[in-house]
Amino acid sequence: MNAPLDGFVVVDLSSGIAGGYCTKLFADGGAGVVKVEAPEGDPLRAWSASGAPVDAAAGGALFSFLACSKRSVVVDPEGDLQAVEDLLAGADAVVWSAGSRLADMDSLRPQRIHERHPHLVVTDRKSTRLNSSHD
């Protein structure tokens, strides 16, 4: 039996809980989700539900829950942006949020992504916040 989103590809350029949960829902629906992280990893890797320190290299339970069923790739913002472009070219949607070194690069802001990849559905998590300081 096929899942509702089989064949749908999402590139996850988000950080934090909201973007992680959004893309988890895509993955749970059968979409192929690729989580893109800078070498230092998503800041969420070091979060714990209790507030106790977590080894970011191992990842905490919250990150593991949100990253379940996703592929993960590491991209160095200073040299591997072509890898991100290749992922975007083959995707159907991208989930973006400010807060990571990768997502905060001008070339990876939602408007710039849409200019280069008009076929993509580009979601910007900041749209749900009032008085956002991000463009």
Outline where the language-model segments fall.
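Short "domain-exit" segments at the C-terminal end of structured domains
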Residues: L130-D135
